UniProtKB/Swiss-Prot annotation:
Gene behind this protein: MB
Taxonomy of the source species: Eukaryota, Metazoa, Chordata, Craniata, Vertebrata
EC number in record: 1.7.-.-, 1.11.1.-
Residues at which heme b binds: H94
Modified residues (Phosphothreonine): T68
Organism per entry: Tursiops truncatus (Atlantic bottle-nosed dolphin)
Name of this chain's protein: Myoglobin
Length: 154
């Protein structure tokens, strides 16, 4: 399940592109998530009123939250699988406060892959996509284990 050094390098190379515009990438990821899986929008009280893509693109709050999401994910990815300290508070809030099902983390992972591929096709070919998929799968597996420890079976 772990990634090789080369795979982590592919993940971190494309992540460098993401960090140049975390808010923009994050906004695109959330829009993709909400359009592809409208049920996920119900978990976000402050975004429920955003019904169209135009509304979502105009929302500074959505952009800020996208920045927050990708900043947290970047910190986790940079740990190359040694992310327990970063994962613990994230799992705690997502399991107990927000009650975000693991399935929704799969949905946002798909959105991340799509956005990275559409925004960075040269840097995000098949090998990089495969590596990022593995990294996101590792993240989901580990957060699911934390959810279980917390008694949340979402």
């Amino acid at each position: 399940m772990g990634l090789s050094d080369g795979e982590w390098q592919l993940v971190l190379n494309v992540w460098g592109k993401v960090e140049a515009d975390l808010a923009g990438h994050g906004q695109d990821v959330l829009i993709r998530l909400f359009k592809g899986h409208p049920e996920t929008l119900e978990k976000f009280d402050k975004f429920k009123h955003l019904k169209t893509e135009a509304d979502m693109k105009a929302s500074e709050d959505l952009k800020k939250h996208g920045n927050t999401v990708l900043t947290a994910l970047g910190a986790i990815l940079k740990k190359k699988g040694h992310h327990d300290a970063e994962l613990k508070p994230l799992a705690q809030s997502h399991a107990t406060k927000h009650k975000i099902p693991i399935k929704y983390l799969e949905f946002i992972s798909e959105a991340i892959i799509h956005v990275l591929h559409s925004r960075h096709p040269a840097e995000f070919g098949a090998d990089a996509q495969g590596a990022m998929n593995k990294a996101l799968e590792l993240f989901r597996k580990d957060i699911a284990a934390k959810y279980k420890e917390l008694g949340f079976h979402g």
